[in-house]
Regions:
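Conserved short loop/turn motifs at secondary-structure junctions
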Residues: 1-2, 102-105, 182-184, 255-264, ...
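Flexible glycine-/small-residue-rich
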Residues: 7-8, 39-41, 103, 169, ...
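Amphipathic alpha-helical transducer elements in NTP-driven molecular machines
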Residues: 10-17, 34-37, 41, 77-88, ...
């Protein structure tokens, strides 16, 4: 008898087949050593659209809301029928007695497999392959320790709840507000609160009022000491005058030894954030690069929320550290003795450990990797080396001075042991980036009571700064920490979305036209700000959505009831529809398309705008309208264009070529003259070009 192993992607199936000896390639699967290895192509099965439940749901109407299926139905994803039928046929083979779920080891991977398994009607026993690396040794080790599929039932229920909640909120809220505002407004359970955070930051920036302030700066033996802020420029100038030419006294010198622990390893979110800071990569780009490196066996599983390793990985981690230390530019680090134990914490690892390189980096030619993947792999290597390096130790020095009765402060530091920061500095130099720690250089050896005959004094002007726009780095951090203060400390999941879904959420907002990228910044568009303005708090509250995400995590751990969660979602949707049945006229204007002024009304002097079917005066009581398909134009097989209308308003005439004469069955050119008599309809006259005088001289 044979086991059928189902992976999430063809590339993963190929690696599994190679590692387990299924070397014979057939149509849609590998075979060998008593195994069949096949694959999904992402999600093969998807929730049915609302129109599939009832014909009337194919049209968007308020009266049909809310749409709350008693039981959810599923359909094959378009274009993936062949992949599904291949898996169904393999599951039905009489020599297959066991199915192995080898889809990605996480919530979505579990859902992808289970929906296929359920739709085929297969009832053969299921085992689960759960691995964090695509190395051959990791695959073989995982296959020798397969777990019963039933052990992951709670994870599957969590995935189902997430999918159903997204469907219920997305379908109902999107239809509700699209119908009310006569424009497609995509509303999502997670993406809308994310948009709300962007809009809130944009409002703070818009409303920010900058304030001027001044500082006095003393230059002493090459070091700079700074005063407190002066809000009154006259007071700052007066203080500077009092300090000129007078002695300066060092009133205190404090020295404190400080230590900085090595940074933690990367989880997906911190990797995406740093890749955005250093390389400008979007969250999606980083995830794509990391996934590709994982499938090439160079990186461990990327969709993780842990920043530690388990104790059974200590030996492997030590080997990988020494391999990474041989790679340029890290081979220039001095006296590197890794401390693996600082990265180990079994209690802080749930499904997957932190992201680290694999042993395969020893054999890989990194120069052959695409530049994005190479940068990311070196970034992960750098973090692994930093995390296992020694403490960064320095002496923080603060010196205070008195000059003319005013106090000044100078700060600096003296490095005692560079530790992990040496690796970070070398890597940043390799990238031609500034060191991460640029705070304070070395101060001269000041002593308390030291007197300086005089010092250079300068007044500098400054302004308070508004909040910074979100970048993908800072937005990912905000998403991760949303609702953190309102969820118990012991809660495992906090924030909007998961490490695996946040990149897609940002991309959806950009694609929908609610957010735009300007350099590294993410800026909400006018449509995005208006959407947040009109939506109720249950849809825009990051805290509420973070609580939902927390509940999904509890369901995955078996600590919460899926039915109770879904009842809460259904109740929220029902209340949403019953509360929002109509909107004000001002509300409707929020999403009205912006009209372009094309000229001035010849009757009343008000602006004339282009509409869908006409060019009309903005003052409705005036009544001046130029219809695009006026009979004057259609009888001549023409349509009034924006340029023609602009000419008529500006010059009272427009030249038109190729007008049709029904009588002569031919085209002709003429000038069309605006002949407005003040009636309901506008009249036009034709003026033909004068023919050139001809003749033979008789």
């Amino acid at each position: 008898m044979s086991k059928l192993i189902i992976a999430e992607k063809p590339s993963v199936a190929k690696s599994i087949a190679s590692a387990l000896g299924a070397s014979s390639r057939a149509d849609g699967f590998y075979e060998g050593s008593g195994l069949l290895v096949s694959w999904c192509v992402g999600h093969l099965v998807s929730p049915m659209d609302a129109g599939g439940y009832d014909e009337r749901f194919k049209k968007w109407r308020y009266d049909d809301l809310p749409i709350l299926p008693e039981s959810f139905r599923y359909v094959l994803a378009p274009g993936k029928e062949d992949a599904f039928e291949n898996l169904r046929a393999l599951m039905d083979r009489p020599d297959v007695d066991t199915i192995v779920n080898a889809c990605d080891a996480g919530r979505e991977g579990e859902l992808i497999f289970r929906l296929v398994y359920e739709m085929t009607g297969c009832r053969k026993p299921v085992l689960r392959l759960w691995i964090s690396s695509m190395e051959d040794s990791a695959i073989r080790e995982g296959f020798s320790d397969l777990r019963p599929g039933a052990d992951y039932e709670a994870l599957y229920q969590s995935a189902l709840c997430r999918q159903k909640a997204d469907w219920l909120v997305g379908i109902n809220a999107t239809r509700l507000f699209s119908v009310l505002y006569h424009r497609t407004l995509n509303v999502g359970r997670v993406q809308t609160p994310t948009l709300a955070m962007l809009a809130e930051r944009d409002a703070k920036i818009t409303l920010f009022h900058k304030e001027k302030y001044h500082l006095l700066r003393l230059t002493l033996n090459g070091a700079e000491a700074v005063s407190e802020k002066f809000t009154d420029p006259a007071e700052a100038e007066q203080a500077a005058a009092m300090c000129k030419g007078v002695t300066v006294t060092c009133t205190s010198v404090t020295k404190e030894q400080k230590k900085e622990q090595p940074p933690k390893l990367y989880d997906l979110t911190t990797l995406q954030r740093e890749a955005n800071r250093l390389f400008g990569y979007t969250a999606k780009q980083t995830l794509d690069y990391a996934q590709s490196l994982y499938e090439k066996k160079l990186l461990t599983y990327p969709r993780t929320d842990s920043r530690y390793l388990t104790s059974d990985m200590a030996e492997t981690a030590s080997c990988v550290i020494h391999l990474a230390a041989k790679l340029p530019p890290f081979d220039g680090c001095s006296n590197f003795f890794p401390l693996v134990e600082t990265m180990i914490s079994d209690k802080d690892v749930s499904d997957h450990h932190a992201i680290i390189p694999t042993m395969e980096i020893e054999k890989a030619d990194l120069k052959l990797l695409p530049v994005g993947e190479r940068n990311l792999l070196l970034l992960v290597c750098c973090k692994l080396l930093c995390a296992s390096a020694e403490l960064y130790v320095y002496e923080a020095v603060t010196a205070t001075f008195d000059c003319g009765g005013y106090s000044f402060t100078a700060k600096g530091k003296r490095i005692l042991s560079e530790g992990w920061r040496e690796i970070d500095r070398i890597f940043r130099a390799f990238l031609k980036e500034k060191p991460a720690d640029g705070d304070g250089g070395t101060l001269p050896d000041f002593t308390e009571g030291q007197i300086f005959d005089s010092a250079e004094i300068a007044v500098t002007e400054h302004f308070t700064q508004p909040p910074k726009t979100y970048t993908e780095d800072t937005l990912l951090s905000a998403m991760e920490n949303a609702g953190k203060d309102d969820i118990p400390d012991e809660a495992e999941r906090k924030g909007l979305g998961t490490p695996a879904t946040r990149a897609a959420i940002i991309e959806k907002l950009v694609t929908a036209g609610f957010v735009e990228r300007k350099g590294k910044s993410l800026i909400p568009t006018k449509a995005g700000i208006n959407l947040v303005t009109v939506l109720p708090e249950p849809l825009t509250s990051p805290m509420l959505t973070a609580e939902w995400e927390q509940k999904l995590t509890e369901i995955a751990k078996g600590g919460a009831d899926p039915d109770t969660f879904m009842d809460g979602i259904r109740t929220m949707v029902q209340e949403l529809v019953s509360t929002y049945s109509c909107i004000s006229e001002d509300g409707k204007k929020l999403f009205a398309p912006e009209k372009e002024v094309i000229g001035t009304c010849p009757r009343c002097g008000q602006p004339v705008y282009e509409g869908k079917k006409n060019f009309a005066c903005s003052d409705r009581s005036c009544g001046f309208v130029l219809w695009k398909n006026d009979r004057f134009w259609t009888s001549r097989k023409k349509e009034l264009t924006k340029k023609m209308a602009t000419d008529l308003l500006k010059k009272g005439r427009t030249n038109v070529k190729g007008m049709w004469s029904e009588k002569k069955q031919a085209t002709y050119d003429a000038a069309v003259i605006l002949n407005d008599t003040g009636g309901k309809y506008i009249n036009f006259k034709l003026e033909f070009p004068k023919r050139k005088a001809g003749g033979n001289g008789r």
